[in-house]
Amino acid sequence: DVTNRHDLLDNLKNNKADLVIMGEPPKNIPLISQASMKNPLIAIAHPENELLKKEKVTIKDLKKETLLTREVGSGTRITVERFTGLNFNSDIQINSNEAIVEAVQAGLGIGFVSMHSVNLQLKNKIIKQLDVEPFPIVRQWHIVHHAEAELSPIARRFKQFVINNTRVKKYL
């Protein structure tokens, strides 16, 4: 199930999921977490966006654009706000990365997503990565389970598979 941070945490707290893959795990829930690979967050734009013509794009430039961001409480949104100082209250909130990418493709604004979620679109030049400090913001993906939950043999094997096959060097 692909969902937002709030729902992932609810699933962990209430033992609705054996394992989750997420960004930064919270400290207020007893969890066992292992970082599995880097997760670079990038700024993306429509290929004809004027910012792509600038030699140096700044956060000040981004403030003049329509910003497409995840909902309040999203790990991506929290990270982007923390690292950039951007305030998204007056911009467009979208509840999925796929919808953000589609909105960027339609020329509706600048989006912030995991590079892993847009490799194909970048390769096909459907969207472009904006070169703006402090992006890419490199976080980690974590594989997480509740500390008090006993993992089934299948869940243990899957966890080990993820850890063994998502080495940081392979994906950045």
Predicted regions and their residues:
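Hydrophobic residues within well-ordered alpha-helices
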Residues: 12-13, 62, 80, 102-109, ...
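Short helix-loop capping/hinge motifs at secondary-structure junctions, enriched
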Residues: 48-58, 74, 148-154
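Central regulatory/effector-binding core of bacterial HTH transcription factors
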Residues: 1-29, 94
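Alpha-to-beta junction loops
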Residues: 12-22, 41, 104-111, 126-127
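Flexible hinge/capping segments at coil-to-helix
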Residues: 30-67
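Secondary-structure junction motif
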Residues: 65-86, 151-159, 168-172
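A late-sequence structural motif
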Residues: 130-171
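Short beta-strand->loop
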Residues: 32-42, 124-138
